[in-house]
């Protein structure tokens, strides 16, 4: 008896024609098996039940294979870009980023004010000049203090004979 269905792999399934199914109840000579003994009818019933199970398992695997091969198309919403508001709505003014105008003041990364560029910090004052005056004052005070501490060791102008006459 030829097999009803063969499977080489789970994905491939070969089903046989209906003529093969009709030949199940006959032996090789084409004669009916009705006149044979009870044991042969049992084997025929066993073969039929086995073949029915094979066909049902083949159908189940075919359904699984068909389900596995189905695909689903995904639809992506297309981006339409920025849309304008309705004509009657209140429009907000679009602000551009605040750029450094090169004015006076602190550099733009710190303390705000948009300063940077130019000759030093401060609002309308010359900061560099004030710093220079402070440094000169500190230098003068340092020399004056040295003269007070070391004045007796070195002597004064009167001791060296450099006094005005």
UniProtKB/Swiss-Prot annotation:
GO terms for biological process: chloroplast organization; chloroplast proton-transporting ATP synthase complex assembly; thylakoid membrane organization. Residues 79-89 have a biased composition (Low complexity). Residues 90-101 have a biased composition (Basic and acidic residues). Changing residue 108 to S: In yl1-1; yellow-leaf phenotype due to reduced chlorophyll content; abnormal chloroplast morphology, and decreased photochemical efficiency; early flowering and senescence; reduced plant height, tiller number, and grain weight. Residues 71-118 are annotated as: Disordered. Induction: Induced by light in dark-grown seedllings. Highly expressed in leaves. Expressed in leaf sheaths. Expressed at low levels in stems. Residues 1-51 form a transit peptide. Keywords: Chloroplast, Plastid, Transit peptide. It comes from the Eukaryota. GO terms for cellular component: chloroplast. Disruption phenotype: Yellow-leaf phenotype due to reduced chlorophyll content. It is found in: Plastid, Chloroplast. Required for photosynthetic protein complex assembly in chloroplast thylakoid membranes during leaf development. Maintains the abundance of the core protein complex PsaA-PsaB of photosystem I (PSI) in the thylakoid membrane. May play a role in the efficient biogenesis of the chloroplast ATP synthase complex, possibly by interacting with the beta subunit atpB. Interacts with atpB. This is Protein YELLOW LEAF 1, choloroplastic. It comes from Oryza sativa subsp. japonica.
């Amino acid at each position: 008896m030829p097999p009803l269905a063969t499977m080489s792999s789970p994905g491939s399934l070969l089903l046989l024609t209906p003529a093969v199914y009709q030949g199940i109840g006959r032996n090789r000579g084409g004669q009916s098996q009705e006149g044979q003994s009870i044991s042969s009818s049992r084997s025929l019933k066993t073969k039929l039940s086995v073949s029915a199970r094979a066909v049902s398992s083949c159908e189940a695997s075919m359904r699984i294979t068909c389900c596995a091969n189905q695909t689903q198309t995904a639809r992506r919403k297309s981006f339409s870009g920025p849309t304008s508001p309705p004509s009657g709505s209140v429009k907000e003014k679009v602000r551009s980023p605040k750029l450094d105008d090169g004015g006076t003041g602190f550099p733009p990364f710190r303390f705000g004010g948009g300063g940077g560029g130019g000759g030093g910090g401060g609002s309308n004052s010359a900061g560099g000049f004030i710093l220079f005056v402070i440094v000169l004052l500190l230098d003068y005070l340092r020399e004056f203090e040295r003269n007070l501490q070391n004045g007796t060791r070195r002597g004064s102008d009167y001791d060296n004979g450099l006094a005005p006459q």
